[in-house]
């Protein structure tokens, strides 16, 4: 609504408390004209505070209104503070405006959403300016609920945002109304654990895989700093074949599968605890990788 006002470029409306009372409220109550009608006239207590910025004639972070006040009780002097879906609650002490004799009174109020006295406090603040020493006995004799003709109110949100209660409004694109859906965080499944093979592959042309990269002969023993036990070398398949050919024997070690002993390895008469060609390989396969 500010585009309806003929204001000069760079105009800002930041009046002091004295200016609001002396130059605006006093003239309004006296039915005198105001040079620039920059303050709207509404019944402020019929609206929620977040609806008021759209009803103001001017304002960016603060909005000003002339509003009447009604009595809470027909025979009392307390104002009715119910407004929209909640109520305004006074906070702090009243501040007199004007020296040496106060001309107006400033009162601070906070808006609570819901029914009193269990409403939820919001960040909406109102500074209400009223004239001091006003005789309201005439209106009381007429049994009127009107307490004051006009008070001047400054409305603002102390967090600088026009917060509102209730669900957010739908987003409008052209002629279509699209509802905002809640954002759901995408669940990312963790990668499957890598499975290690339980089987070892032996190439007949080479020896059993080694735990270290340095090649060793059958007579070398290499101790890695990563292991506390020794790593024994593995016999080559070609060595076993040579032994077998020299003895005119195949790789038949006479292994007794019942009592797990070698009866006659390579045709010899040695006992079962003597060395035989597969001992190194069996010991290697029993060690954990």
Swiss-Prot record:
Listed GO biological process terms: cellular response to hypoxia; negative regulation of abscisic acid-activated signaling pathway; response to wounding
This protein's UniProt keywords: DNA-binding, Nucleus, Transcription, Transcription regulation
A family per Pfam: NAM
GO cellular component, one term: nucleus
NAC domain ranges (all copies): 7-158
Family matches, as SUPFAM superfamilies: NAC domain
Domain of life, per lineage: Eukaryota
Gene3D superfamilies (alphabetical): NAC domain
Molecular functions (GO terms): DNA-binding transcription factor activity; kinase binding; transcription cis-regulatory region binding
Location, primary (coarse class): nucleus
Location(s) in or outside the cell: Nucleus
Quaternary organization: Interacts with KIN10 and KIN11.
Domain notes: The NAC domain includes a DNA-binding domain and a dimerization domain.
Protein name, per record: NAC domain-containing protein 2
Source lineage: Eukaryota, Viridiplantae, Streptophyta, Embryophyta, Tracheophyta
